[in-house]
Structure formats: structure tokens, C-alpha cells
Amino acid sequence: MKVLVWTVMTYGAEGWTLRTDEKNRIHAAEMWCYRRLLNVTHKDRRTNASILEELNTDRQLYGIVVKRKLSYFGHMSRKKNLNLTKTIIQGKPEGKRGKGRPRTAYIDNVKQWTGLSAHGAFQATLDRDAWRLRTKKAVQAANTLTDEAAKK
């Protein structure tokens, strides 16, 4: 399942901007796959925690998306030339901003997961080993928060 389904589901995840509703959809899709694997329907009224316990696993899909995004961010921010992708990641496009509440930017996810400012995140990526460690901690934190939510 992880080889076939998750790779298709997370295709292009490096460029996603994740809000709470997308996070919930990722969790729901993962649980849907687990339920199909066990041939359990919602009519059976089984909790997500019991499904995860039976499979002896934790929710992992959101952590995979976090890892891909942070790895890609590190790769792009270390590039020397200033290209369009780096400009977009920095959140500095040209033109006027639209009305209403600002959309969640790519860098907002990075700041939330790493606990750094935008400038601090760009500086932290220069040391690849430290950035890998920070990415690993962010993935563990994302999976831990997900597991706690599943058990409630």
C-alpha cells in the first residue's frame, strides 16, 4: 500500500501549502486506506485508534509530507542563483496583494514546523546535517501530534 497508493497520493507534496483542512484530509485518506486494507466499513463503528492498534502502526502520511516539504525547502534555499521557485518560496512575488485574509504561504508551514523565523530557516538550511536533524525532529513532532489526536 505504501509503495503504490501513498506515492500517488503524495505526488507533488513538496509544493503544497498545508492548512488545517488539508491536514485533516490527509489523515482521513490514510485512515480510509487502512480501513480498506482490513475490509472495515464505517458502519462497523470502529474507532481510528482501534484500526491503528490492530495494524500495529501509527499515522505516518502527514509526517511524510512534512519531510518532503522541509527537504525540498532546504534544497531550494541552498541554491545560489535566485530563480522563480526561490522567489515564490520566499513569498515575495511581484504585484498587488488581493483583498481579504492573506493565504497561507509556503514559508508559513516551514516556520510552524521548525519554530524558526523565515530568515532563520533560510540560514539553518546552509548546514545540511543540522537541517536534516531539524527535519527529523519536525516529522517526529508531526507524527506525535497526529497519534495523540487519533487516540482521543
PLM feature spans:
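Short linear motifs embedded in intrinsically disordered, charge-biased segments
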Residues: 1-152
